[in-house]
Design a protein with these regions (language model features):
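Core catalytic region of metal-dependent phosphoesterases/phosphodiesterases
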Residues: 4-14, 30-144
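Short acidic, Gly/Ser-rich segments with clustered Asp/Glu that frequently serve as metal-coordination loops
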Residues: 17-24
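Active-site metal-binding loops of divalent metal-dependent hydrolases
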Residues: 15-17, 63-66, 120-122, 168-169, ...
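Conserved beta-sheet core of the metallophosphoesterase superfamily
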Residues: 107, 134-145, 150, 158-224
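Short coil/turn segments at secondary-structure boundaries
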Residues: 24-27, 72-74, 177
Length: 224
């Protein structure tokens, strides 16, 4: 979690309710720790943003937030078994409360918030259901907008900046600038272009490709 290079826009992401035991990995990680680290990260971003003339926030949600997509067996959408902490239904309620908490915190500092949902391969169904639930919860908030469509790549224009996000399990990195130029008419109207991915769940160094900078978000898990 970090502010992107345009000083007036901040994307934020919480992902991966996966399980990590200290006797296996050397560090404990569970759903409570994931929530705590996420809230600490949001607080840290808000502190770092203090003093900047920020008039717009972008919050990225989705991206394997549920980690699994079945109520039993701990399996992803395609059936891959995962290590999880707690029940599937617990995950949904925890993620819902966390998203609501984050959004309410952000708009208390900066009143203009755009929430972007990126569908993902671990929780293609329940991730969307969660995003739709959050959008419904804030449906009467005039200063919060949502994009919860199932498009694989989302784009947002902020002055002369074109900001894209995608989960990252589809098109290869070197193709993303070409897809952005083909799919988004604002390509020719903007000077600075960014694409953020999430699939690898850890930070990858910035890559400056033709006409676009690409970066991957990390998750709160110990390995990241």
């Amino acid at each position: 979690m970090f502010p992107i290079t345009t000083p007036s826009t901040i994307p934020i992401k919480w992902t991966n309710n996966s399980l990590c035991k200290s006797f296996v990995s050397g560090e404990e990680y569970n759903k409570q720790i994931a929530v705590q680290r996420t809230l600490e990260a949001v607080d840290g971003i808000l502190q770092k943003s203090n003093g900047f003339n920020i008039d717009k926030l972008i919050l990225c949600i989705g991206n394997d937030v549920m980690h699994i997509d079945t109520p039993s067996g701990g399996k992803t959408t395609k059936g891959t078994v995962q290590d999880v902490d707690g029940m599937f239904f617990e995950h949904f309620h925890i993620a819902k409360r966390l998203y609501i908490n984050i959004i309410e915190t952000l708009v208390s500092f900066y009143p203009d918030l755009h929430v972007v949902y990126n569908s993902s391969n671990h929780d293609y169904l329940t991730g969307f259901c969660l995003a739709d639930t959050i959008a419904t919860y804030f449906r009467n908030s005039k200063n919060i907008t949502f994009d919860i469509s199932l498009q694989h790549r989302k784009y947002y224009t902020y002055y002369n900046n074109l900001i894209g996000s995608t989960h990252g399990d589809g098109a290869k990195w070197d193709l993303l600038p070409l897809l952005m130029a083909d799919e988004c008419k604002e390509w020719s109207e903007t000077k600075y272009r960014y694409m953020f991915t999430h699939h690898v769940h850890h930070k990858i160094g910035n890559k400056d490709l033709i006409g676009c900078s690409i970066e991957s978000f990390r998750s709160p898990s110990p390995a990241d």
